[in-house]
Amino acid sequence: MELLDGRALANELTHAQQTAVETLKEQGVTPKLVVIMVGDDPASAIYTQSKQKRATKIGMASELKRLSAETTEAELLALVKTLNDDRTVDGILVQLPLPKQINEDHVIQAIDAKKDVDGFSPVNIGQLWLNQPGLVACTPNGIMRLLAAHKIDVAGKNVVIVGRSNIVGRPLAALMLNANATVTIAHSRTANLKALTKTADILVAAIGKPHFFGIDAVKEGAVVIDVGINRLEDGSVTGDVDFEALQTHVSAMTPVPRGVGPMTITMLMEQTIEIAKERVKRG
């Protein structure tokens, strides 16, 4: 079995990103990412720190805007508008989830599509489904890069994606379709789920159920991408597939951790750098 090691690829790409940032600085532009965090959700704080740490590592400018949990939607939208208008800001990211008094859709739609490094805006999602250039959700983008790095061609393959979220399942389906795969999206209402997943040449598991997919649900020789992050009672982290059972059954598989996760932040940095390159072109 080939191990699809996201951490190793992320480290390679991080070195390349450091060089790209140095080149941009020589041209008078420092890529800048602004992360907005509303409230003090512990998980959000960890994700936010990881993003800032990586940005600093590659030499980018990074700013965290911390707002209280009582922040109104109008106040948050006003901040987003200010950042949209700031020419020194390349990427804007609003850490989700938001407090209940704020409509997430309104906020995502307010972010300038050209600065929407999460790739969640309706404009970017529309461009993705039309197979046109735009900013793409980072986890699906990272999955495609990981497959490409291991020379796994998805064209003509049967791809089953289990999970239909706007963050992973739906955008990944579009990317796979654009790469000429035959795509099926499965979800909680799918009948005979494991019979369906067993037909997949490439299986993407993103349902949040530890060890849900074993040999009975996976075709021999398949490629398995495990997006699941599940914390067990002993504190360990595991994915949606039974990694141990499948090691001798599949041709390639991502581990959890060290698989898809490291690629997500790496793609976030890459998109911010690409936006900064466009700023250089505009002068």
Swiss-Prot record:
Q: Does the keyword NADP apply?
A: yes
- Reaction(s) this enzyme catalyzes, per UniProt: (6R)-5,10-methylene-5,6,7,8-tetrahydrofolate + NADP(+) = (6R)-5,10-methenyltetrahydrofolate + NADPH; (6R)-5,10-methenyltetrahydrofolate + H2O = (6R)-10-formyltetrahydrofolate + H(+)
Question: GO CC terms on record?
Answer: cytosol
Pfam families per the record? Answer: THF_DHG_CYH, THF_DHG_CYH_C
- GO MF terms held by the record: methenyltetrahydrofolate cyclohydrolase activity; methylenetetrahydrofolate dehydrogenase (NADP+) activity
Ligand binding (NADP(+)): 163-165, 188, 229
- Name the Gene Ontology biological process terms: L-histidine biosynthetic process; methionine biosynthetic process; purine nucleotide biosynthetic process; tetrahydrofolate interconversion
The alphabetized UniProt keywords are: Amino-acid biosynthesis, Histidine biosynthesis, Hydrolase, Methionine biosynthesis, Multifunctional enzyme, NADP, One-carbon metabolism, Oxidoreductase, Purine biosynthesis
The pathway to which it is assigned is:
One-carbon metabolism; tetrahydrofolate interconversion
Record's superkingdom?
Bacteria
Entry EC number(s): 1.5.1.5, 3.5.4.9
Query: Which family is this protein grouped under?
Result: Belongs to the tetrahydrofolate dehydrogenase/cyclohydrolase family.
Function per UniProt = Catalyzes the oxidation of 5,10-methylenetetrahydrofolate to 5,10-methenyltetrahydrofolate and then the hydrolysis of 5,10-methenyltetrahydrofolate to 10-formyltetrahydrofolate.
Under NCBIfam families, the record lists: PRK14169.1, PRK14186.1
Quaternary structure annotation from Swiss-Prot or TrEMBL: Homodimer.
Name under which the protein is recorded: Bifunctional protein FolD
Source species of the chain: Latilactobacillus sakei subsp. sakei (strain 23K) (Lactobacillus sakei subsp. sakei)
